Every structure is written in structure tokens, then in C-alpha cells.
Amino acid sequence: MGDKKSPTRPKRQPKPASDEGYWDCSVCTFRNSAEAFKCMMCDVRKGTSTRKPRPVSQLVAQQVTQQFVPPTQSKKEKKDRVEKDKSEKEAASKKNCHKKTRPRLKNVDRSSAQHLEVTVGDLTVIITDFKEKAKSAPASSAAGDQHSQGSCSSDSTERGVSRSSSPRGEASSLNGESH
């Protein structure tokens, strides 16, 4: 009786000898070279199991407590809060619907706008160039304050903010400095 073989179950085929230099990744099934310690596609270590890891008891307990937080407010207080939130959202949406606000930089002097038109083909783009605001100096350097208030344009050309087409040498000679 021990000599009978099950006809319904085929035997497992041995792997061909040509696969000796490779191993298949258990996650992405990529065929890696035998020298590779990690999968070249998904960086999973060689021999890593694809089984789901056991849940850590501390993590499970933490997730359970987060799921079942008991309600602390009464139904009446909750209802009042929901109505208040709705009225605030409606008021905010009414304010925003007729005025769109653009993000603005804080260190820009808006009164110093220069408009440049650039046309390429049939497309014209207007570039608005602003100068940087003069930074307020600390109270301890009174002499420095007087210098920075004397001439706004010379201050900006010294820092290289101006988009003048003149070279740096000419810009510094305009400030009263000689070389």
C-alpha cells in the first residue's frame, strides 16, 4: 500500500542549473544577480519573507484607544458648536468670493514698480520689477541710519538689487566713490 502514488498531485519540478547565478525577489519578483545583497528594484534584502509582520501589542493598544475616544461634550453643546462653525464658514466664503488675494512678499517696495514688456512671437508678457525695501538698522548704529536714509537708489545698487544694464564699476562711481 505504501507504493501507491497520488495521480492528482504533480511533483515539483527542480530548478534548471542555469538559475544558479540569480535569485528572485520575494516582493517584486525581479531577478537579481547572486552577488546582490538587496533587490535592485525595491531594495528589499535577500531572503526577506513576504508574510505580514505580527502586530506589536503596544501599537495595537494605542490605536484602539484612539478609535474609541468617549464623547466629552453633550449633544446640545456639540450642536451649538456645529452651528457656530457653519456661520463662520458662510461669513468667510462671502468675504472671499468678490476679492481674490495674491500672495505678497514683505520686503518689496511697491511704490518702485518698473514695467517691462517682452514679446516673443505673438505672446506679450509684462514683467513688473520692484526694488527691495530698505532694511531698518538697529538703534545702536545711528551713523548707519543716516547713511541708508540719504540715498535709497545708491543703497540698492550697492547690494546689486538694481537691474541696471551698466557694469558694477560704473554703478559704484555714481555713488561718489572714486577708484
Swiss-Prot record:
Residues 146-155 have a biased composition (Polar residues). It is found in: Nucleus. This is YY1-associated factor 2. Keywords: Metal-binding, Nucleus, Phosphoprotein, Transcription, Transcription regulation, Zinc, Zinc-finger. The gene is Yaf2. It comes from Mus musculus (Mouse). Interacts with MYC, MYCN, RNF2/RING1B and YY1. Part of the E2F6.com-1 complex in G0 phase composed of E2F6, MGA, MAX, TFDP1, CBX3, BAT8, EUHMTASE1, RING1, RNF2, MBLR, L3MBTL2 and YAF2. One of its GO terms (biological process) is negative regulation of DNA-templated transcription. Residues 1-23, 47-117, 133-179 are annotated as: Disordered. The modification Phosphoserine is found at S166. PROSITE patterns: ZF_RANBP2_1, ZF_RANBP2_2. In the mesoderm, expressed in the region close to the surface ectoderm. InterPro entries: RYBP/YAF2, YAF2_RYBP, Znf_RanBP2, Znf_RanBP2_sf.
